[in-house]
Amino acid sequence: MAQTLAQTKQISQSHTFDVSQSHHKTPNDTNSHSVIYSTQNLDLWYGENHALQNINLDIYENQITAIIGPSGCGKSTYIKTLNRMVELVPTVKTAGKILYRDQDIFDQKYSKEQLRTNVGMVFQQPNPFPKSIYDNITYGPKIHGIKNKKVLDEIVEKSLRGAAIWDELKDRLHTNAYSLSGGQQQRVCIARCLAIEPEVILMDEPTSALDPISTLRVEELVQELKEKYTIIMVTHNMQQAARVSDKTAFFLNGYVNEYDDTDKIFSNPSNKKTEDYISGRFG
């Protein structure tokens, strides 16, 4: 099955980065991980509002990167540039580059559809389709041309197992996804994302609408997923960022104020504003 879906992808997986030549903000212990995203001198405007300013940020493969900062600082805007969803806003304009596996995603020849196959997204509010669980999971693979029932069945099981919810739902696959709890719906949305075999998963506050038990399950799942995927997660929850992430970027007023290993950010930040934010003095 993996080969069948992989054949529908046209973005080359062979590009690599020479990390030693990076001139961007990088954490210290990155020797064992390749750069998958390199944001270079990125500026973004909503009309006249300069929402992102001179963003330089390298994201490392098979790591969890937390994006933190107060409301309106540019966190969600930034991750939506990574799969170009931000372009759904008519007044948006950008300058600078975002390299995904050494290709500029803003290049006119670069396919947004291909990018969004490789870079999945999970939103703040669970947003399953008004369809059965089975149809939710198979939606993406069907768009990519997979019609074989056996292959689709395998994708459903693999994806739900990947989202740690197969045992809960295996006897309810043809139930409407709206009938599930909020935590179950969010894990179905994660499974739907996994079904198209992305390399990167963007998460925009994926647990903010969930109860504590569901939040814990999603956090445990995120830790497991980084073995196969690169995860970039926006969160307002400082404890969550400290628990689950490897790297943390602190955004403030549209800038990257500090970016480092999560342990360093939360134990000995280099910037006073970072310290003030994570200690709750503002935000």
Curated annotation (Swiss-Prot):
Q: What is its EC number?
A: 7.3.2.1
UniProt keyword terms in alphabetical order: ATP-binding, Cell membrane, Membrane, Nucleotide-binding, Phosphate transport, Translocase, Transport
Identify a single GO molecular function assigned to this protein: ATPase-coupled phosphate ion transmembrane transporter activity
Name one cellular component (GO) term: plasma membrane
Q: How does it sit in the membrane?
A: Peripheral membrane protein
So which domain of life are we looking at? Bacteria
Q: Which CDD domains match?
A: ABC_PstB_phosphate_transporter
Q: Where is this region: Disordered?
A: 1-33
**Substrates-to-products reaction catalysed:** phosphate(out) + ATP + H2O = ADP + 2 phosphate(in) + H(+)
Subcellular localization: Cell membrane
First-listed, main subcellular location of the protein, grouped into a coarse class: membrane
How it assembles, according to the record, is: The complex is composed of two ATP-binding proteins (PstB), two transmembrane proteins (PstC and PstA) and a solute-binding protein (PstS).
The record's function comment reads:
Part of the ABC transporter complex PstSACB involved in phosphate import. Responsible for energy coupling to the transport system.
Q: What is this protein called?
A: Phosphate import ATP-binding protein PstB
Organism expressing this protein natively: Staphylococcus aureus (strain bovine RF122 / ET3-1)
Origin organism lineage: Bacteria, Bacillati, Bacillota, Bacilli, Bacillales
